[in-house]
């Protein structure tokens, strides 16, 4: 009997709020989903509904005025909800990454995408040669 595939990413009851002089504003309320290897998830909604806040919460890239109020973020079964910045730097770009909504600030249009992916891999695997990493990026490894 085949083992059920484990979730690569699981978000459980995630709620995120922003603190301002006017008080607390809830931007993400009780969101849950899970993704297995090879699955794709589309997050759609009106402008300002919390899509970017949700994704930035998962990546732990929220501004200081924001706080994860409740819920869990599991990456390959490991709870990363309370990871500090140093721990996140080790997994961002290697275990998962994000291309932000504004492609002009995310991808450099004058550099081939393969080279940009290779740069991210080199940050996490400095012992690999630039050529080796570039070739791996071309075949999506």
How would you describe each model-predicted region?
Residues 49, 66, 98, 103-115:
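Conserved catalytic motifs of ABC-family nucleotide-binding domains
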Residues 80-97, 123, 130:
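ABC ATPase NBD coupling module
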Residues 2-8, 17-30, 37, 61-67, ...:
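A short, flexible loop at the N-terminus of ABC-type nucleotide-binding domains that lies
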Residues 67-79:
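Conserved ABC transporter NBD signature motif
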Residues 49, 139-141:
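Conserved small/polar residues in nucleotide/adenosyl-binding loops
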Residues 59, 74, 104, 110-123, ...:
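Short helical segment in ABC ATPase nucleotide-binding domains corresponding to the A-loop/adjacent helical element
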């Amino acid at each position: 009997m085949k083992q059920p595939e484990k979730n690569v990413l699981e978000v459980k009851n995630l709620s995120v709020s922003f603190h301002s002089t006017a008080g607390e504003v809830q931007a993400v309320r009780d969101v849950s989903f899970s993704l297995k290897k090879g699955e794709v998830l589309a997050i759609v909604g009106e402008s300002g509904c919390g899509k970017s806040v949700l994704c930035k919460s998962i990546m732990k890239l929220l501004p200081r005025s924001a706080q994860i109020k409740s819920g869990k973020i599991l990456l390959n079964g490991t709870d990363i909800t309370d990871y500090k910045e140093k721990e996140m730097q080790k997994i961002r770009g290697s275990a998962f990454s994000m291309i932000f909504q504004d492609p002009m600030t995310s991808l450099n249009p004058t550099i081939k995408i393969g080279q940009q992916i290779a740069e991210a891999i080199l940050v996490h695997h400095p012992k690999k040669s630039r050529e080796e990493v570039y070739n791996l990026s071309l075949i999506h490894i």
